[in-house]
Amino acid sequence: MDRPALLAVPALVLAALTVPLRGLVAFEAARAAISPVVLLSLLSRVLWTLTAAVGFAAVGYVYGRRGGRAPSARVFGVAAVSAFFGAAVGGVLFSFGAAVTAPGGPTVKYVFTGLYAALDGLLFGLLVVGGYAPTLTPAR
């Protein structure tokens, strides 16, 4: 398995676990019926924050090596930017969506929870793209 595939597999596994679990928070029926799943959903926010703060930078550093040379600045940059925006923007969206209590609030809450889940998927995709970028060599 080449380096991009090794990068893509853990990113896809984390995305497959995190994105659907977070989406369950938006549904009141799931809250009432399946409390352990809701607990996992809430814990997925912690998982996402840890992954963004530590995982992106670490994976970018490890997989950013090219031919035994120093880590690629491009991959490390993608990892750092993903970590910052993932934690900051995701936290703001989640807090805003959870704080909505006005009439029509559930709809807004569903929209923002969905946006947060989409942000998760987008940033995991960005991580995978960042892993592929340094492995592409221009044709000569």
Regions found by a protein language model. Name each.
Residues 1-20, 35, 65-78, 130-140:
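Haloarchaeal acidic low-complexity proteome signature biased toward cell-envelope/secretome components but also
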Residues 9-22, 82-90, 124:
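Alpha-helical transmembrane segments of multi-pass integral membrane proteins
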Residues 4-8, 28-52, 110-120:
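Transmembrane alpha-helix entry/boundary detector in multi-pass membrane proteins
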Residues 49-68:
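Canonical alpha-helical transmembrane segments
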Residues 75-102:
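C-terminal halves and exits of single transmembrane alpha-helices
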Residues 23-32, 93-104:
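Juxtamembrane "helix-exit" motif on the non-cytosolic side of transmembrane helices
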